[in-house]
Amino acid sequence: MVYNIFGFYSYAVGLALVALMAVTCYECDIMKFVSPIGKKPALVLSFMVIMCVGPLLVIPRTGATAYEMGIKPILGFHNTFTITAVAIIFFMLTYFLTVRPSKVVDIIGKFLTPFLILALVVIIVKGIISPLGAPAETAKINSVLGKGLIDGYQTMDCFVSLAVGSVLLLTLKNKGYSEPKQQIKMLFKSGLIACTTLGLIYGGLTYLGATVSAKYGLDVEQSQIIVNVTQNLLGNAGKVALGLASFLACLTTSIGLTSASGEYLVNITKEKIKYSTFILCICLFGTVTAIIGVSGIVKIGAPILAVVYPPTIILIILAFFKDKIKNDLIFKLPTFTAVTISFIQVFYEQTGLFKFITVLPLSSIGFNWIIPSFVAFVIALFIKKK
């Protein structure tokens, strides 16, 4: 369990804070952050980052989570009709509350987040005081560390840091923090608090999962485990309270992400397509995708994230040295190498072709792109800028 938590924390929590600090080197502008790799590659990478935390993965996942943690436990049964009906209602609400913004959403979000955190803390503390069981004696997977690292991908907290950095910076400016040093200091403090809180919650939930690990197999949905644990610890009332809070939290998250994604798409298309049209398309796609469930969306997202994360991580690291890097090849060569290796790895996992990719170092934990990217970085250092 320790290795799994370490791996998960590294990507889900640690990398999110580092990413936030990295994007501050570019005035919290994601387009400036990716610009060193060239105009077209930068546009593609930034587009994929925004799509992952928006319409492609996270927005549909909010709808699926709202059903699996909010409605399904209350209903007590599940079928295709119920999840379809809930997905339609969920994204209809998302559409109307995004196209016609309401203060109700802000009010719900303001009070709901503290309530949801409090509810999770109560569940975790109760689970620590009265554990439901002992962790399984042997791991059910081959690479516990690798699984933790890859699961950290799925939170996409790193991408969120890059995507919302500009919003956080604007908020600080509106509060009177006009000096860049002040802004960076406050961003670090707020990021540290947020990541620490996330870390404690993730750690607590991991522990709760470990206490029932002997009871469940790998085929059980993660959301179902949380629901079952909550019911065992706090009874039906606790399950219903968590369900309602989860549904509303997912709804406010969906509205915020849909709005931000719509504005981004309007900007990159230079307002050739209406905002409301993008919102409608996002909600329709979210409805269809949410029906496959959280686990299904996670499976779809895994290969996409496996390709998008490595180049993003390299740019995050190099961002701290941008003032000393005079040759863009130092950004481009390792980044393109990471994309290439990651793409081949994903292709191998899907088809069985190009098995040679498994010979590379760190393949067992899914990080065979690191050494080749480092070699590419070293080579780029010796190539003179024309």
Please identify what each model-predicted range represents.
Residues 51-55, 125-132, 141-205, 241-250, ...:
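Hydrophobic, membrane-embedded alpha-helices of multi-pass small-molecule transporters
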Residues 64-82, 173-174, 254-281:
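Helix-loop-helix connectors at the membrane interface of multi-pass transporters/channels
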Residues 2-84, 88, 92-95, 99:
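Membrane helical hairpin/interfacial module
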Residues 39-53, 84-88, 143-151, 232-249, ...:
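Select transmembrane alpha-helical segments in multipass membrane proteins
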Residues 98-127, 301-313, 333-339:
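Membrane-interface loop-to-helix entry segments
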Residues 26-33, 90-112, 174-177, 287-299, ...:
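Membrane-water interface regions at transmembrane-helix termini and the short interhelical loops
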Residues 313-378:
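C-terminal membrane-solvent junction of multi-pass transporters and transport-like membrane proteins
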Residues 196-225:
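Extracellular/periplasmic helix-exit of transmembrane alpha-helices
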